[in-house]
Curated annotation (Swiss-Prot):
One of its GO terms (biological process) is ribosomal large subunit assembly. InterPro entries: Ribosomal_protein_uL10, Ribosomal_uL10, Ribosomal_uL10-like_insert, Ribosomal_uL10-like_insert_sf, Ribosomal_uL10-like_sf, Ribosomal_uL10_arc. It comes from Thermococcus gammatolerans (strain DSM 15229 / JCM 11827 / EJ3). GO terms for cellular component: cytosolic large ribosomal subunit. This is Large ribosomal subunit protein uL10. The keyword Glycosyltransferase does not apply.
Amino acid sequence: MAHVAEWKKKEVEELTKIIKSHPVIALVDVAGVPAYPLSKMRDKLRGKALLRVSRNTLIELAIKRAAQELNKPDLEKLADYIEGGAAILATEMNPFKLYKLLEESKTPAPAKPGAVVPKDVVIPAGPTSLAPGPLVGEMQALGIPARIEKGKVTIQKDYTVLKAGEVITEQLARILNALGIEPLEVGLNLLAAYEDDIIYTPDVLAIDEQEYINMLQQAYMHAFNLSVNTAYPTKQTIEAIIQKAYLGAKNVAVEAGYITPETVEDILGRAIRAFLLIAQNLPEELLDEKTKELLNAQAQVAVAAPQPAEEKVEEAEEEEEEEEEASEEEALAGLGALFG
């Protein structure tokens, strides 16, 4: 039986203890990360997460031992994601916040031949600090729209030289470095994270926050409208439900001519308008003085306030927009409360 070094046993024990004492365990790849950026990352994580760099085999043993001791078989699956120069990142931060923190902590790095770019690389339009030379011919050979203007190399328009996932060639690395474009990123790449018997991979954690906020707002508005339209009272919708019921009852009363303190003005106004509509089609000799006065007053109001149809439509649309905005603001104000 092969002898196992004592330091390896202690390392596995220490790693196991770290894994068991934190609710979220992530694997990150530190391969290729220079010492200084790694040190800066440790400083940024201090108080938020514990970064422990070790050998892949020892990390795997520690994960399996912790899974067995905690009776959490799903934790053992985390070992399947060990690759490169893996390290353990133990934290109480949820995996989504952890992923965001790691991504925001990455810094640009110069181009290296053979490296894979994480996102599209675009050479922006405009003058550069480069003097005319052989590099211009190399750029043009690659399709980069470069030319000499006023003794300097100028890029005629934005040009994408690499798509995300493509490899940097030696020639392109030389051009990008000469232009001062840093297409690579230095930082900790999250391989996978474990929390509550679930393994999270980067493609799951890389969410568009604004998109999800919009989805939540839309879902809230639909729920709000459904609650109001089905008269299902909640803290957020009771006022709108009562207002809708009041207006509905008032309209029914007005249509039926049922007089109450709230409807008498609308009913009388409606009756007067109907009366004047009939009166204006009758011969003048059949009208009494009071009716004539009412018709004249109505005509003067119409003449005194002429308004083009287009203006009326625009104003009506503006009023509707203002009402909609106010309604949306009022509804969205309770977004957090409705969803707990």
